[in-house]
């Protein structure tokens, strides 16, 4: 076997459709575009969503949902599982977490969420707690201060 003897598998190469080359070619005359109308003409068709002059659906439907919140509450978020490396009876604040490298950016007041497990007792001072986080901190013997 040589490179000069190689050829593609039979049926793997499909011939390009040549339109407008006479009726006998199978795609002559109207070239597969039907008879008359906008879709048979040259050039691009209509834009997406165009309904022939009728008021399109995206303009008939009312604009109701997905308003942006004007004054969103942005929190610096930390999960309970991230606090397990801290020593017991430590006072946890946003400043202490930034000093420890657990939190890198100050996106607003601290909020503690309940993902993960906590085994050490900590005194956590934050702006907000989720219900699960509060339960896990108190179950480990710690306290929550808002």
Swiss-Prot record:
Start and end residues of each stretch annotated as Disordered: 1-52
Residue ranges with Basic residues bias: 11-20
GO biological process terms, semicolon-separated: translation
UniProt GO molecular function: rRNA binding; structural constituent of ribosome
Gene Ontology CC: cytosolic large ribosomal subunit
Gly residues bias locations: 23-35
Gene3D superfamilies with a match to the protein in the record: 3.100.10.10
Keywords: Ribonucleoprotein, Ribosomal protein, RNA-binding, rRNA-binding
NCBIfam families, per the entry: rplO_bact
Assembly and oligomerization: Part of the 50S ribosomal subunit.
Functional description taken from the UniProt entry: Binds to the 23S rRNA.
Family, similarity comment: Belongs to the universal ribosomal protein uL15 family.
Protein's name in the database: Large ribosomal subunit protein uL15
Organism the protein comes from: Picosynechococcus sp. (strain ATCC 27264 / PCC 7002 / PR-6) (Agmenellum quadruplicatum)
């Amino acid at each position: 076997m040589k490179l000069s003897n190689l050829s593609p598998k039979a049926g793997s190469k499909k011939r390009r459709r040549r339109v407008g080359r006479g009726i006998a070619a199978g795609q002559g005359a109207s070239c597969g575009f039907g008879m008359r109308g906008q879709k048979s003409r040259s050039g691009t068709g209509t834009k997406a969503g165009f309904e022939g002059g009728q008021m399109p659906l995206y303009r008939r439907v009312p604009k109701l949902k997905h308003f942006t919140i004007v004054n969103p509450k942005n929190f610096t978020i930390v999960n309970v599982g991230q606090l397990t490396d801290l020593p017991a009876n430590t006072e946890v604040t946003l400043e202490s977490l930034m000093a420890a490298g657990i939190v890198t950016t100050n996106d607003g007041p601290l909020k503690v969420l309940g993902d993960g497990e906590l085994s050490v007792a900590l005194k956590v001072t934050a702006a907000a707690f989720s219900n699960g986080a509060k339960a896990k901190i108190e179950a480990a013997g710690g306290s929550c201060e808002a």
